[in-house]
Amino acid sequence: MNKKVIYTTIFGGYDELTEPHFVPDGWDFICFTDTDLKSKNWKIVKTTPFYNDNTRNAKQYKALPHRHLSDYEYSIFIDGNMTIRNNPDELISNYLSNSNVAFFDHNKNLLDPRDCIYKEAEIIFEFGRRNGNYKDNPELIKSQMTKRNDGRRETCNSQITAMARNNK
């Protein structure tokens, strides 16, 4: 089985697909999308959306790779606007030798560190206002942010931008 894949999702044209800086031997690159994309390194898998919501469509693939990538022993999810800069085999040996899953903190992203769901919500609102394309329903986001702690803001916590899995 020893097949390995790096995968991403782009629905509704929210992100631009970034080409990897490093293309490791023995790894496939797959992008699940509902738009016409072209890439030198990514295999574009155009799919019919499950939902009428881009965020939920993306999460269908992000959170459930075993349903869509069952032939792969190892899978690494990255956000569509992220890129591979180093050998993912090192990531597998460092983080999955004694675990089945590893999550990676958005705050460690050197180009765009964020550690707070409230900051993320503000960025989604700003992006939507500028571009007319919201990542999710703004009213739903506001409701979730208010409901989270009865209107009180909590200490910011990590967000997941990448996930590695041992699928065997």
Question: Which residues fall in each region the model found?
Answer:
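Glycosyltransferase catalytic domains, chiefly GT-A lineage
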Residues: 1-168
